[in-house]
Amino acid sequence: MNSDLTSFDKIEQKIGGSRKTSNYIIGGMLTIGGIGFLLASISSYTGKDLLPLGNPSTLLFIPQGIIMGAYGVVANLLNFYLWYMVYINFGSGSNSFNKSSKSVEIKRKGLFKDIDVKLNFDEIKSVKLDISEGFNPRRRIALVLKGRKKPLPLSGAGELKPLLQVEEEGARLAKFLNVNLEGLK
């Protein structure tokens, strides 16, 4: 929940997607590495140096050139996938809570189609804080719905906010929705 636009009867939260600095850095590294491996493979096949560094034309095509070509193809496939995710801003969206109409609208950008979930306040049982520390920490806010076992996450994937900020956002949302707050120990 990157930004909150709060009024007395409405809360709007913008969710960031895959347009993160880390994805740009990894995408750039994959692009350079994938093209480099493909050029090294082609250089070993043709006997001409296509790279400014090193001397890949001296490599044997079998097995080094073929393996480098395979690495290049795999890297470029991952590279195209990652750049496509960045282009469509996968996972971005918004959460909208409207007290006057007693409705919740959750929108996310999907791979092939957008996700749009509309709920009434009556369907919400509580707001849950899902906090786990350790090797792969997770701090997210979710809605527990009546008749559904799994909570509906509201936070964006990969967001790691300070614990105090997550607790404050969860408490403010629970108070706004007039439901209980779960997950605090």
Curated annotation (Swiss-Prot):
Coiled coil: none annotated. GO terms for cellular component: photosystem I; plasma membrane-derived thylakoid membrane. InterPro entries: PSI_Ycf4_assembly. Seems to be required for the assembly of the photosystem I complex. It is a multi-pass membrane protein. GO terms for biological process: photosynthesis. Pfam families: Ycf4. Belongs to the Ycf4 family. This is Photosystem I assembly protein Ycf4. It is found in: Cellular thylakoid membrane. Keywords: Membrane, Photosynthesis, Thylakoid, Transmembrane, Transmembrane helix. The lineage of its organism: Bacteria, Bacillati, Cyanobacteriota, Cyanophyceae, Synechococcales. The gene is ycf4. The chain crosses the membrane at residues 24-44, 66-86. It comes from the Bacteria.
